[in-house]
Amino acid sequence: LANQLNSCDDELNPKNQNGIVAFDTSSFENTILGGQTGMTISYFDGKGVTLSSPLPNPLVSASQNIKVKIENPINPSCFAERVLPLKVIPLPNVDLNENGSYSELVCTNIIGYTVTLNAGVSGSSASTYTYKWYLDGVEIPNETKSTIVVGKAGLYSVDVSNSNNCF
């Protein structure tokens, strides 16, 4: 049976994260059966409520443990049960404006003027994330910290990701 299934709570606007995502269940039954045929699969949520079999694809869900029961219909005493953990991983907590973005005005008509841009990570240590900075959509080489000093006009953006590659 499959290990824990992780999915990032990656709403277009991170302010809309709600802990519910669409899990791809298209390969669940093939993975569970591992080539066996003629078996019956039953699914139960954390409260023991029977779920549809096969599971809907996608399965829209919050983090939960789904119990899977595989049974031989010819010999009902021959069965196996496993727990399939579904985990929704929140995105990094970044301070954003009401439009779901972070913006800062940089005046570049002053020679030698620079400004420090901050990735806006809040709620956790900035060192627990990885950063990729971009200027006009092109990755800036070797800029991997939570702040960047800039003096060139353009649109700066940053991808902030956690250890699960959610960004």
Q: Language-model segments: which ranges?
A:
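Proline- and Ser/Thr-rich low-complexity, intrinsically disordered segments
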Residues: 1-167
